[in-house]
């Protein structure tokens, strides 16, 4: 009898993880793109939210007390001034200097009903030498969740940063000085989610709106013979989903039915993504720590766009911003079209509250799909996450989905020289990287698959973070289009980001970060791109909120058809935190 109770308690705990927060589980049907690093498994490894198993019910009070003890509201507005020097250490390049004046705010909030983390910064640069002009820059990253009532949350996120405008162009890793191939991008998403226990059923629903905008600051300089491509403009994205499920108990298995709809409209070539699905899933516990998963459903997805307007020579016409002009007189053409049965099967293993593994294989998009996730927390200071994803995505949808996958609690960090937001963020509960999305502002829709790993840890006065991954994109363009030659082009990206920080004493600290990127370019005539960099910063508080910083960095870039670059940079600055 005792063994039966243990078995049922373990089975209920597994099922709670799969069925609790059912809105997230249904939404994950649209979240298997780059950057999430979790695919459909994201909800599987997440703690139960809004509804708990019998075991977690008994522990809920203890968790609530811990949350109250961890109540934190830390909002730090600041003013900053700095002097920057950059020098091209190869090829006899220029030495550039400029002064920065910045205002910003870093915030971490954790209360009973709200969680948020943000770093927002406005900066003006006064160019001084090397022909460098003045510039205004806005950058930031924010994630927040607000519980309006039990089970009903409003979530949102925003990103403002700079990235590579064209994956076939340079990747200096440092968007300062005379760098080319620079795009200013802005992305935001927001929406409500609802999780509710109705009798012995779990109900979930949600909606998300996303918007992404790109301004090309400095166009890419491409290798000889590489044709100039299109440039991303803006897109809007709507996602809605709902689900209803039941955990094992009355039945020897758990079940869930779900459905969703998504649409994205892009300004470029009147591009449109539209998808809908309905499916049923079952969870069959076979031991206190293992459950079998299975699902079957129907899905319809269409991606379409129009051709660019052609001049008398058959060359696409461009507007003043270098973007293709849409030929609205031509009919819409399909880039991708699927309509039919989808299925997947898998297993979930949860031997302890600190370890969980989910793996699935199935059929979607007319192809075999593999997804999964692994999470391991050996202690309260260390977390390792691994995600495998495969799905349809775009630059805009990838950014908003990647933002939604980031934690609401993280340490806001930036490049100490350029002030840009780091591509990877780390927190005590989870982390994430937007490196795949920021590698290339492609205008085409694509099939995205890959793997992402995150490690974050604290030991004594040290804190560490590592983000690494691989992302593969297969471009989807109408075969009958004048741009049809790039249909099926495969781009691959490998990335690594490492950061470490140490509090030296009560008044000073040291931070170090580095990155390594490799972009395997599949575009005709384009060459592969590799870049790497490392930076270090020392900060010391002199008086109350006044802090001085000294930083140095080294960035390297190499691509066939270009001179390799080695850029050294240094900064000295003062910040006053209010």
Model-predicted regions and their roles:
Residues 28-578:
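Gram-negative and organellar
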Residues 1-27:
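Gram-negative bacterial Sec-dependent N-terminal signal peptides
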């Amino acid at each position: 009898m005792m063994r039966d109770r243990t078995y049922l308690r373990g089975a209920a705990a597994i099922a709670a993880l799969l069925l609790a927060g059912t809105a997230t589980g249904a939404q994950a049907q649209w979240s298997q793109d780059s950057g999430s690093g979790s695919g459909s498994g994201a909800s599987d490894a997440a703690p139960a939210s809004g509804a708990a198993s019998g075991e977690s019910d008994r522990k809920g009070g203890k968790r609530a007390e811990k949350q109250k003890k961890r109540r934190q509201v830390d909002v730090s507005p600041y003013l900053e001034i700095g002097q920057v020097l950059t020098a091209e250490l190869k090829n006899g390049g220029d030495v550039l200097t400029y002064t920065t004046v910045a205002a910003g705010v870093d915030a971490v909030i954790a209360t009973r009903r709200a969680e948020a983390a943000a770093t927002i910064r406005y900066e003006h640069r006064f160019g001084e030498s090397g022909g460098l002009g003045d510039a205004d820059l806005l950058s930031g990253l924010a994630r927040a969740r607000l519980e309006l009532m039990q089970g009903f949350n409003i979530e949102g996120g925003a990103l403002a940063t700079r990235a590579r405008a064209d994956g076939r162009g340079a990747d200096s890793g440092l968007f300062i000085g005379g760098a080319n191939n620079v795009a200013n991008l802005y992305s935001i998403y927001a929406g409500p989610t609802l999780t509710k226990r109705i009798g012995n059923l779990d109900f979930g629903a949600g909606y998300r709106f996303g918007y992404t905008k790109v301004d090309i600051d400095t166009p890419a300089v491409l290798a000889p013979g590489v044709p100039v491509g299109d440039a991303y403009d803006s897109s809007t994205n709507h996602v809605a989903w709902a689900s209803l499920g039941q955990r094992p108990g009355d039945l020897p298995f758990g079940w869930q039915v779900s459905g969703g709809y998504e649409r994205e409209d892009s300004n470029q070539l009147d591009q449109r993504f539209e998808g809908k699905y309905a499916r049923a899933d079952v969870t069959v516990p076979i031991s206190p720590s293992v459950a079998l998963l299975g699902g079957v459903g129907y899905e319809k997805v269409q991606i379409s766009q129009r051709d660019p307007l052609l001049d008398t020579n058959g060359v696409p016409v461009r507007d003043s911003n270098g973007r293709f002009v849409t030929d609205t007189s031509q009919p819409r053409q399909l880039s991708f079209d699927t309509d039919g049965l989808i299925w997947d099967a898998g297993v979930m293993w949860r031997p302890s509250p600190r370890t969980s593994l989910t793996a699935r294989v199935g059929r979607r998009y007319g192809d075999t799909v593999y997804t999964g996730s692994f999470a391991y927390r050996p202690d309260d200071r260390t977390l390792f996450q691994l995600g495998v994803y495969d799905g349809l995505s775009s630059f805009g949808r990838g950014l908003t989905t990647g933002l939604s996958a980031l934690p609401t609690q993280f340490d806001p960090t930036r490049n100490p020289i350029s002030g840009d937001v780091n591509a990877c963020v780390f927190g005590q509960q989870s982390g994430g990287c937007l490196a795949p999305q920021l590698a290339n502002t492609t205008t085409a829709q694509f099939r995205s698959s890959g793997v992402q790993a995150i490690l974050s840890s604290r030991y004594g006065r040290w804190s560490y973070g590592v983000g690494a991954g691989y992302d593969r994109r297969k471009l989807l363009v109408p075969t009958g289009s004048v741009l049809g030659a790039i249909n099926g082009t495969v781009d691959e990206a490998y990335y690594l980001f490492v950061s470490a920080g140490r509090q030296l004493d009560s008044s000073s600290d040291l931070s170090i970060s580095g990155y390594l990127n490799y972009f395997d370019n599949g575009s005709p005539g384009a060459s592969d791109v590799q870049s790497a960099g490392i930076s270090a910063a020392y900060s010391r508080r002199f008086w109350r909120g006044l802090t001085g910083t000294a930083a140095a960095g080294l960035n390297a870039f190499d691509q066939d058809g270009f001179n390799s670059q080695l850029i050294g940079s240094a900064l000295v600055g003062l910040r006053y935190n209010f």
